[in-house]
């Protein structure tokens, strides 16, 4: 009775909470071996709480990331949606990439990573550029709820997904990614089906924004015609405001 309300904390959880540290109470490798979804969950907690994952836990995540293939995609998708709803989704995706889990279920996104140099000319790393775009978008729509902007966030994450398939180097000109928005838009249905995301109007919305995302850039050109502006307004329809973010 004299110990009623006394917290029993054999693993030092209170201290970890105070210090903003995530760790597994038992052996990390065994923990993630028992249920590999905990790898994605750890990235999600780090993303939502702004906590750091301790090194032994990260090592366990790396060692067992290959076991992601035993999971149903529905379970992974549920965690992905929570990462996408966070204030800084890039944290979760960086962790999943660094531990090798992202490669297991989202290879199209990982394909954006890397910098190639030809004749001294290099292109930017489109993976980390994409994560920055997502974070910037989330910040710019902070007055709107995460549920309201969820599919806009997915569109930002997938906006350059077609670049690896359209990358070209032209001597004397440099790197180009012509048509990457169309290639990316065509990839959306297959990715949504595999990732167990809804293949309804929400997918159509993402596909539309990916397809049109490069068009507003052309409007910066002083020579752009009024008809080009009208075409964009017509093609974008109700999504014009989201497209311009």
Describe the role of every protein-language-model region.
Residues 220-222:
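Active-site-proximal binding-pocket segments
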Residues 1-157, 161-203, 207, 211, ...:
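Glycine- and charge-enriched loop/helix tracts that form the active or gating conduit
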Residues 154-165, 224-245:
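Alpha-helical scaffolding flanking metal-ion-dependent phosphate/phosphodiester catalytic sites
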